[in-house]
Protein backbone atom coordinates (compact mmCIF):
# COMPACT_ATOMS: atom_id res chain seq x y z
CA UNK A 1 0.00 0.00 0.00
CA UNK A 2 1.44 3.43 -1.01
CA UNK A 3 1.80 6.26 1.48
CA UNK A 4 -1.01 8.06 -0.40
CA UNK A 5 -3.51 5.48 0.95
CA UNK A 6 -2.04 5.78 4.44
CA UNK A 7 -2.47 9.57 4.38
CA UNK A 8 -6.05 9.26 3.08
CA UNK A 9 -6.88 6.72 5.80
CA UNK A 10 -5.67 9.19 8.45
CA UNK A 11 -7.76 11.98 6.85
CA UNK A 12 -4.78 14.00 5.59
CA UNK A 13 -4.70 15.50 2.08
CA UNK A 14 -1.81 13.79 0.23
CA UNK A 15 0.32 16.13 -1.93
CA UNK A 16 3.50 15.44 -3.93
CA UNK A 17 6.61 16.25 -1.91
CA UNK A 18 8.43 18.01 -4.77
CA UNK A 19 5.90 20.65 -5.93
CA UNK A 20 7.66 24.00 -6.25
CA UNK A 21 6.70 27.60 -5.43
CA UNK A 22 4.91 27.84 -8.81
CA UNK A 23 2.18 25.69 -7.21
CA UNK A 24 1.51 28.39 -4.60
CA UNK A 25 -0.36 30.71 -6.94
CA UNK A 26 -3.64 28.78 -6.47
CA UNK A 27 -3.72 29.67 -2.77
CA UNK A 28 -2.61 33.24 -3.61
CA UNK A 29 -5.58 33.51 -5.99
CA UNK A 30 -7.86 32.33 -3.19
CA UNK A 31 -6.39 35.07 -0.96
CA UNK A 32 -7.00 37.65 -3.72
CA UNK A 33 -10.59 36.44 -4.15
CA UNK A 34 -11.30 36.78 -0.41
CA UNK A 35 -9.70 40.25 -0.36
CA UNK A 36 -11.64 41.44 -3.44
CA UNK A 37 -14.95 40.12 -2.08
CA UNK A 38 -14.47 41.89 1.28
CA UNK A 39 -13.25 45.23 -0.11
CA UNK A 40 -15.91 45.09 -2.85
CA UNK A 41 -18.65 44.61 -0.25
CA UNK A 42 -17.56 47.70 1.72
CA UNK A 43 -17.32 49.75 -1.49
CA UNK A 44 -20.78 48.59 -2.64
CA UNK A 45 -22.28 49.92 0.64
CA UNK A 46 -21.30 53.49 -0.32
CA UNK A 47 -21.38 53.31 -4.14
CA UNK A 48 -24.32 54.75 -6.13
CA UNK A 49 -25.07 53.14 -9.52
CA UNK A 50 -26.31 56.30 -11.24
CA UNK A 51 -24.53 58.12 -14.09
CA UNK A 52 -24.92 61.50 -12.32
CA UNK A 53 -23.74 60.24 -8.92
CA UNK A 54 -21.34 57.30 -9.57
CA UNK A 55 -18.21 59.44 -10.07
CA UNK A 56 -19.09 61.63 -7.07
CA UNK A 57 -19.78 58.54 -4.91
CA UNK A 58 -16.26 57.18 -5.64
CA UNK A 59 -14.79 60.59 -4.64
CA UNK A 60 -17.01 60.52 -1.51
CA UNK A 61 -15.65 57.03 -0.62
CA UNK A 62 -12.01 58.13 -0.99
CA UNK A 63 -12.39 61.51 0.78
CA UNK A 64 -15.13 61.22 3.40
CA UNK A 65 -15.50 57.57 4.43
CA UNK A 66 -13.06 56.44 7.16
CA UNK A 67 -10.45 54.23 5.43
CA UNK A 68 -12.48 54.49 2.22
CA UNK A 69 -9.33 55.36 0.24
CA UNK A 70 -7.76 52.14 1.59
CA UNK A 71 -10.72 50.03 0.45
CA UNK A 72 -10.85 51.71 -2.97
CA UNK A 73 -7.09 51.38 -3.61
CA UNK A 74 -6.98 47.82 -2.24
CA UNK A 75 -9.81 46.83 -4.58
CA UNK A 76 -8.17 48.49 -7.62
CA UNK A 77 -4.62 47.20 -6.95
CA UNK A 78 -6.05 43.82 -5.83
CA UNK A 79 -7.62 43.36 -9.28
CA UNK A 80 -4.20 43.79 -10.93
CA UNK A 81 -2.65 41.41 -8.41
CA UNK A 82 -5.42 38.88 -9.16
CA UNK A 83 -4.52 38.96 -12.87
CA UNK A 84 -0.76 38.77 -12.21
CA UNK A 85 -1.38 35.61 -10.16
CA UNK A 86 -3.81 34.05 -12.65
CA UNK A 87 -1.50 34.64 -15.63
CA UNK A 88 1.43 33.04 -13.76
CA UNK A 89 -0.94 30.20 -12.72
CA UNK A 90 -1.90 29.58 -16.38
CA UNK A 91 1.73 29.85 -17.57
CA UNK A 92 2.72 27.26 -14.94
CA UNK A 93 -0.07 25.00 -16.24
CA UNK A 94 1.21 25.29 -19.81
CA UNK A 95 4.86 24.74 -18.83
CA UNK A 96 4.31 21.68 -16.64
CA UNK A 97 1.56 20.08 -18.75
CA UNK A 98 -1.13 20.44 -16.08
CA UNK A 99 -3.70 20.82 -18.87
CA UNK A 100 -3.64 17.02 -19.20
CA UNK A 101 -6.03 17.00 -16.25
CA UNK A 102 -8.81 18.09 -18.64
CA UNK A 103 -11.63 18.77 -16.16
CA UNK A 104 -9.46 21.02 -13.99
CA UNK A 105 -8.03 22.89 -17.01
CA UNK A 106 -11.41 23.50 -18.69
CA UNK A 107 -13.04 24.61 -15.41
CA UNK A 108 -10.06 26.99 -15.01
CA UNK A 109 -10.68 28.52 -18.46
CA UNK A 110 -14.36 29.02 -17.55
CA UNK A 111 -13.13 30.76 -14.38
CA UNK A 112 -10.82 32.98 -16.45
CA UNK A 113 -13.69 34.13 -18.70
CA UNK A 114 -15.87 34.86 -15.64
CA UNK A 115 -13.02 36.79 -14.01
CA UNK A 116 -12.41 38.84 -17.16
CA UNK A 117 -16.11 39.71 -17.38
CA UNK A 118 -16.16 40.72 -13.69
CA UNK A 119 -13.07 42.94 -14.12
CA UNK A 120 -14.56 44.59 -17.22
CA UNK A 121 -17.86 45.41 -15.48
CA UNK A 122 -15.94 46.72 -12.46
CA UNK A 123 -13.81 49.01 -14.63
CA UNK A 124 -16.96 50.74 -15.92
CA UNK A 125 -18.40 51.49 -12.45
CA UNK A 126 -16.35 54.61 -11.45
CA UNK A 127 -17.85 56.28 -14.58
CA UNK A 128 -14.63 58.07 -15.49
CA UNK A 129 -13.65 58.98 -19.06
CA UNK A 130 -11.75 55.76 -19.77
CA UNK A 131 -14.45 53.67 -18.03
CA UNK A 132 -17.14 55.09 -20.31
CA UNK A 133 -15.17 54.88 -23.56
CA UNK A 134 -13.75 51.41 -22.85
CA UNK A 135 -17.33 50.22 -22.21
CA UNK A 136 -18.48 51.87 -25.46
CA UNK A 137 -15.74 50.24 -27.56
CA UNK A 138 -16.03 46.74 -26.04
CA UNK A 139 -19.86 46.53 -25.96
CA UNK A 140 -19.92 47.80 -29.56
CA UNK A 141 -18.11 44.60 -30.59
CA UNK A 142 -21.45 42.80 -30.17
CA UNK A 143 -22.70 44.64 -33.28
CA UNK A 144 -20.22 42.53 -35.29
CA UNK A 145 -22.46 39.45 -34.74
CA UNK A 146 -24.43 38.94 -37.99
CA UNK A 147 -28.22 39.52 -37.82
CA UNK A 148 -28.44 39.60 -33.99
CA UNK A 149 -25.65 42.10 -33.22
CA UNK A 150 -27.63 45.36 -33.06
CA UNK A 151 -30.46 43.77 -31.05
CA UNK A 152 -28.00 42.24 -28.54
CA UNK A 153 -26.14 45.55 -28.11
CA UNK A 154 -29.38 47.47 -27.48
CA UNK A 155 -30.46 44.77 -25.02
CA UNK A 156 -27.12 44.96 -23.15
CA UNK A 157 -27.17 48.78 -23.03
CA UNK A 158 -30.82 48.93 -21.97
CA UNK A 159 -31.34 51.62 -24.63
CA UNK A 160 -29.80 53.07 -27.78
CA UNK A 161 -26.59 54.22 -26.08
CA UNK A 162 -24.59 53.60 -22.90
CA UNK A 163 -26.66 55.27 -20.20
CA UNK A 164 -28.08 54.86 -16.69
CA UNK A 165 -29.63 51.37 -17.28
CA UNK A 166 -26.21 50.16 -18.57
CA UNK A 167 -24.42 51.28 -15.40
CA UNK A 168 -27.14 49.75 -13.17
CA UNK A 169 -26.95 46.33 -14.85
CA UNK A 170 -23.13 46.41 -14.94
CA UNK A 171 -23.13 47.04 -11.18
CA UNK A 172 -25.58 44.15 -10.65
CA UNK A 173 -23.41 41.85 -12.77
CA UNK A 174 -20.21 42.99 -11.04
CA UNK A 175 -21.83 42.19 -7.69
CA UNK A 176 -23.17 38.72 -8.60
CA UNK A 177 -20.25 37.37 -10.69
CA UNK A 178 -17.76 37.05 -7.76
CA UNK A 179 -20.16 34.59 -6.12
CA UNK A 180 -20.21 32.57 -9.34
CA UNK A 181 -16.37 32.71 -9.28
CA UNK A 182 -16.41 31.38 -5.69
CA UNK A 183 -18.69 28.47 -6.78
CA UNK A 184 -16.55 27.69 -9.83
CA UNK A 185 -13.37 27.90 -7.72
CA UNK A 186 -14.84 25.30 -5.33
CA UNK A 187 -15.58 23.01 -8.29
CA UNK A 188 -12.07 23.67 -9.68
CA UNK A 189 -10.44 22.66 -6.35
CA UNK A 190 -12.69 19.58 -5.95
CA UNK A 191 -11.88 18.40 -9.49
CA UNK A 192 -8.16 18.91 -8.79
CA UNK A 193 -8.22 16.80 -5.64
CA UNK A 194 -10.01 13.84 -7.25
CA UNK A 195 -6.80 13.05 -9.17
CA UNK A 196 -4.29 15.15 -7.23
CA UNK A 197 -1.84 17.76 -8.39
CA UNK A 198 0.97 17.13 -10.87
CA UNK A 199 4.63 17.97 -10.07
CA UNK A 200 7.55 19.68 -11.89
CA UNK A 201 8.84 16.35 -13.23
CA UNK A 202 5.46 15.42 -14.71
CA UNK A 203 5.67 11.97 -13.12
CA UNK A 204 3.27 10.01 -10.92
CA UNK A 205 4.02 10.94 -7.30
CA UNK A 206 1.66 8.46 -5.55
CA UNK A 207 4.59 6.63 -3.90
CA UNK A 208 6.04 9.85 -2.47
CA UNK A 209 3.31 12.00 -0.96
CA UNK A 210 3.28 14.08 2.21
CA UNK A 211 0.36 15.62 4.15
CA UNK A 212 -0.69 19.07 2.91
CA UNK A 213 -0.66 20.41 6.47
CA UNK A 214 1.75 21.53 7.91
CA UNK A 215 4.22 21.33 4.99
CA UNK A 216 2.44 22.95 2.05
CA UNK A 217 0.08 25.06 4.18
CA UNK A 218 3.11 26.84 5.70
CA UNK A 219 4.59 27.26 2.22
CA UNK A 220 1.29 28.78 1.01
CA UNK A 221 1.15 31.12 3.99
CA UNK A 222 4.65 32.41 3.22
CA UNK A 223 3.85 33.37 -0.40
CA UNK A 224 0.45 34.82 0.61
CA UNK A 225 2.23 36.98 3.24
CA UNK A 226 4.78 38.19 0.64
CA UNK A 227 1.93 39.00 -1.76
CA UNK A 228 -0.06 40.97 0.86
CA UNK A 229 3.14 42.83 1.90
CA UNK A 230 3.74 43.84 -1.74
CA UNK A 231 0.09 44.90 -2.01
CA UNK A 232 0.34 47.17 1.05
CA UNK A 233 3.69 48.65 -0.09
CA UNK A 234 2.07 49.56 -3.44
CA UNK A 235 -1.03 50.88 -1.63
CA UNK A 236 1.09 53.09 0.65
CA UNK A 237 3.59 54.51 -1.83
CA UNK A 238 2.14 54.14 -5.35
CA UNK A 239 -1.68 53.85 -4.99
CA UNK A 240 -2.32 55.20 -8.53
CA UNK A 241 0.46 53.23 -10.23
CA UNK A 242 -1.92 51.22 -12.43
CA UNK A 243 -4.73 53.79 -12.81
CA UNK A 244 -5.37 55.57 -16.11
CA UNK A 245 -5.04 59.38 -15.79
CA UNK A 246 -8.14 59.78 -18.02
CA UNK A 247 -10.24 58.05 -15.37
CA UNK A 248 -9.77 60.97 -12.95
CA UNK A 249 -12.16 62.95 -15.19
CA UNK A 250 -15.91 62.31 -15.18
CA UNK A 251 -17.33 60.48 -18.23
CA UNK A 252 -18.17 62.86 -21.07
CA UNK A 253 -19.81 61.36 -24.19
CA UNK A 254 -18.96 64.58 -26.10
CA UNK A 255 -15.16 64.25 -25.68
CA UNK A 256 -13.33 61.15 -26.96
CA UNK A 257 -9.96 60.36 -25.30
CA UNK A 258 -7.00 60.49 -27.68
CA UNK A 259 -6.19 56.83 -27.05
CA UNK A 260 -8.86 54.45 -25.72
CA UNK A 261 -7.40 51.43 -23.95
CA UNK A 262 -8.53 48.96 -21.26
CA UNK A 263 -6.69 48.06 -18.05
CA UNK A 264 -3.16 46.62 -18.52
CA UNK A 265 -4.32 43.02 -17.92
CA UNK A 266 -6.58 43.14 -21.02
CA UNK A 267 -4.02 44.82 -23.28
CA UNK A 268 -2.81 41.53 -24.84
CA UNK A 269 -6.37 40.67 -25.97
CA UNK A 270 -7.01 44.29 -27.03
CA UNK A 271 -3.75 44.27 -29.04
CA UNK A 272 -4.89 41.12 -30.89
CA UNK A 273 -8.32 42.73 -31.51
CA UNK A 274 -6.70 45.87 -32.99
CA UNK A 275 -4.24 43.92 -35.15
CA UNK A 276 -7.08 42.76 -37.45
CA UNK A 277 -8.59 45.62 -39.51
CA UNK A 278 -12.05 44.03 -39.54
CA UNK A 279 -14.67 44.25 -36.79
CA UNK A 280 -15.94 40.65 -36.92
CA UNK A 281 -12.45 39.21 -37.52
CA UNK A 282 -11.02 41.22 -34.63
CA UNK A 283 -13.85 40.14 -32.29
CA UNK A 284 -13.32 36.47 -33.19
CA UNK A 285 -9.54 36.84 -32.68
CA UNK A 286 -10.20 38.46 -29.28
CA UNK A 287 -12.35 35.52 -28.14
CA UNK A 288 -10.02 32.93 -29.71
CA UNK A 289 -6.98 34.42 -27.91
CA UNK A 290 -8.37 33.00 -24.65
CA UNK A 291 -10.48 30.10 -25.97
CA UNK A 292 -7.47 28.56 -27.78
CA UNK A 293 -6.11 27.58 -24.34
CA UNK A 294 -8.89 24.95 -24.22
CA UNK A 295 -7.31 23.10 -27.17
CA UNK A 296 -4.03 22.26 -25.36
CA UNK A 297 -5.23 19.01 -23.64
CA UNK A 298 -6.40 17.65 -27.01
CA UNK A 299 -3.31 18.61 -29.04
CA UNK A 300 -0.62 17.34 -26.63
CA UNK A 301 1.49 14.83 -28.58
CA UNK A 302 4.67 14.46 -26.50
CA UNK A 303 5.30 11.28 -24.47
CA UNK A 304 6.57 13.58 -21.70
CA UNK A 305 3.97 15.66 -19.85
CA UNK A 306 6.15 18.48 -18.48
CA UNK A 307 8.49 20.84 -20.38
CA UNK A 308 11.21 20.32 -17.73
CA UNK A 309 13.12 17.88 -19.97
CA UNK A 310 12.05 19.33 -23.35
CA UNK A 311 14.49 22.16 -24.28
CA UNK A 312 12.98 22.82 -27.74
CA UNK A 313 9.48 23.25 -26.29
CA UNK A 314 10.90 25.41 -23.48
CA UNK A 315 12.29 27.79 -26.13
CA UNK A 316 8.85 27.91 -27.78
CA UNK A 317 7.22 28.64 -24.40
CA UNK A 318 9.53 31.59 -23.66
CA UNK A 319 8.92 32.94 -27.18
CA UNK A 320 5.19 32.85 -26.30
CA UNK A 321 5.81 34.86 -23.08
CA UNK A 322 7.95 37.42 -24.98
CA UNK A 323 5.22 37.65 -27.64
CA UNK A 324 2.52 38.37 -25.04
CA UNK A 325 4.67 41.14 -23.50
CA UNK A 326 5.21 42.60 -27.00
CA UNK A 327 1.45 42.57 -27.78
CA UNK A 328 0.75 44.24 -24.41
CA UNK A 329 3.32 46.95 -25.20
CA UNK A 330 2.01 47.62 -28.75
CA UNK A 331 -1.58 47.89 -27.41
CA UNK A 332 -0.52 50.95 -25.38
CA UNK A 333 0.70 52.68 -28.57
CA UNK A 334 -1.30 54.57 -31.25
CA UNK A 335 -2.77 52.70 -34.26
CA UNK A 336 0.03 53.63 -36.67
CA UNK A 337 3.26 52.16 -38.13
CA UNK A 338 5.42 50.48 -36.92
CA UNK A 339 3.23 49.46 -33.94
CA UNK A 340 0.45 47.92 -36.04
CA UNK A 341 2.92 45.75 -37.99
CA UNK A 342 4.66 44.61 -34.76
CA UNK A 343 1.25 43.83 -33.22
CA UNK A 344 0.15 41.79 -36.27
CA UNK A 345 3.41 39.80 -36.34
CA UNK A 346 3.26 39.17 -32.57
CA UNK A 347 -0.40 38.04 -32.84
CA UNK A 348 0.55 35.54 -35.56
CA UNK A 349 3.41 34.18 -33.41
CA UNK A 350 1.03 33.92 -30.40
CA UNK A 351 -1.48 31.76 -32.28
CA UNK A 352 1.26 29.73 -34.00
CA UNK A 353 2.45 28.49 -30.56
CA UNK A 354 -0.69 26.32 -30.27
CA UNK A 355 0.03 24.73 -33.67
CA UNK A 356 3.80 24.43 -33.18
CA UNK A 357 3.53 22.82 -29.73
CA UNK A 358 1.99 19.49 -30.94
CA UNK A 359 4.38 19.39 -33.94
CA UNK A 360 7.37 19.90 -31.67
CA UNK A 361 6.07 17.20 -29.29
CA UNK A 362 5.83 14.77 -32.20
CA UNK A 363 9.38 15.72 -33.34
CA UNK A 364 10.75 15.15 -29.81
CA UNK A 365 9.10 11.71 -29.72
CA UNK A 366 10.85 10.81 -33.00
CA UNK A 367 14.23 12.00 -31.65
CA UNK A 368 13.80 9.96 -28.44
CA UNK A 369 12.73 6.83 -30.35
CA UNK A 370 15.76 7.10 -32.66
CA UNK A 371 18.10 7.36 -29.67
From Swiss-Prot:
Domain of life, per the record? Eukaryota
Sites binding heme b b562 sit at 75, 174
Please indicate if the UniProt record lists Heme as a keyword: yes
Q: Which GO terms describe its molecular function?
A: metal ion binding; ubiquinol-cytochrome-c reductase activity
Q: Which SUPFAM superfamilies match?
A: a domain/subunit of cytochrome bc1 complex (Ubiquinol-cytochrome c reductase), Transmembrane di-heme cytochromes
**Any one GO biological process:** mitochondrial electron transport, ubiquinol to cytochrome c
Q: What is this protein called?
A: Cytochrome b
What is the originating organism of this protein? Elapsoidea nigra
